[in-house]
Amino acid sequence: TDFNEITGYGYYDGGREKLEKIYSQIFGAEDALVRPQIMSGTHALTLTLFGLLKYGDTMISISGEPYDTLKSVIGLSGDSENSLIKHGIKYEQIELINNDFDYEKIVERVKKGNIKLIELQRSRGYSQRKSLNIDKIEKVISKIKEINKDIIIMVDNCYGEFVEDKEPTQVGADIFVSSLMKNLGAGIA
């Protein structure tokens, strides 16, 4: 019955529901969206950010500069009227130090308040740094949540799936975003 004909509207789609349940169990998450309509990692990140943030909210990247494609979504490059910044969302960035988080700056900034979402990019992207391992991710999430448990922690986990024993949602991340175009961890991020 998982392969029954469907309308395309998502009603009574047992196969999709089962697939998403499997994904949520594998990644230790409350729920999962696994959809062919989400075309890429950047598309998934865009949907997530616009779904979680609204006018006046502040987003902070704690792993330095994001991927080039995400920069235009945020409004750091290009001149899109549809960027987060053009929609009134504030963006801040904290750089990594020696392939690790700047824990002191992060803690200091979190204590100041007025943060809706903290984003971190697990893979190195186009930079020369190493990918962030799960222990570092767990440590920084723990420090943030000790100060403010209501801040949403979002991990850009593209290229990070199945490369370690735990996933970001298993160490305190509220949400992680990934791409099915990438080979779920078989790449060399």
Predicted segments with their positions:
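Conserved PLP-enzyme active-site core in the AAT-like
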Residues: 2, 9-14, 31, 39-189
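Generic structural marker for isolated residues within well-ordered, non-membrane alpha-helices
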Residues: 20
